[in-house]
Amino acid sequence: LALLTILTLAAPLYAGDPLKMYPFKRLQPPSPEMWFGSDNLGRDVFARTIFGARISLMVGLLSAASAAVIGLLIGVVAGYSRSFDNVVMRVMDGLMSIPTILLAIALISLTGPGIGILIVAIAIPETPAVARLVRSVVLGVRGRPYVEAALCGGARLPKVLWRHILPSTIPALMVQAATVCASAILTEAGLSFLGVGVPPEIPSWGNMIASSRLYLAIAPMTIFAPGACLAVTVLAVNLLGDGLRDMFDPRAKRRR
C-alpha cells in the first residue's frame, strides 16, 4: 500500500500522459514504449493505471475520513444523549438498510458525476456503521469509574468527552475507517464501471475496465492491469485493517 502511494505520487516523473491518444497504436501489446500496451483509443494503459490509482486512493481515503469524522460526532453525541440517540439511530438504521450502490447512484443522478459528489455519495451510506460502532464504545466507557469521578469532580462534559471518551473510540474508529476505505475503493470502481462515478475523461480503474471489456480477447492487459491493481489495493487495505485490529486488541489475534 505504501509502495502504491509512492508510485502514484511520483507518477508525473516516469509515467506518460494518460489522456494522450495515439490513433495508429490502438490495442497494442505490451512493449518497451508502453509497458502494459494501449487501449482501444491508443492511450497508454500503464499511465492510465498509475494515474487511476490516484483517483481510487483519493476517493477511498477521503470517503473514509468523511465517514469517520461524521460518524464519530454522531456516535459520541448519541452515546451520551438518550433523546438524541433514539432519533438519530433510527435514521442511521434507515440509511443502513439502503444498498450503498443504489444510494450513491441516486445522489449522483440528481447532481451529475464528479469526484466531490462521488466522495459524498460513498461517505453518506458508510457513516451509519461508524456511528453505531462509536456509540457502542461510548456506552461502554461512559459508566466507568474514572469518567464518573471526573464528572463528580466538577469537570465539564466537553472536557470529559475530549480527555476520556474520545481517546477510547480511536482504536475501533481506525479499524472501521480501513474497512470503509476498502469498501469505498470498490464502490468507486463499481460506479465508474456503470458510468455514474468518475467522469469518463478522468482515468480510473472502474471506467478503464468498462471501456475495455469488449476487447478482452484482443488486449487482455487493458482489463487485467486495472483489475489486478484494484484487487491488490483492496486486499492491502483490508490487511491493514486486520493489522490495526490485532495491534489494538491482541486478544482478537489469539482467538483466531
Where are these predicted regions, by residue range?
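Generic hydrophobic transmembrane alpha-helix motif, especially the helices
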Residues: 35, 39, 69, 79-80, ...
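Amphipathic cytosolic juxtamembrane alpha-helices at the membrane-cytosol interface
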Residues: 43-58, 62, 82-89, 139-143, ...
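Amphipathic alpha-helical segments that mediate coupling or scaffolding at interfaces
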Residues: 49-52, 56, 77, 91, ...
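Alpha-helical transmembrane segments of multi-pass integral membrane proteins
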Residues: 59-63, 78, 89-93, 121, ...
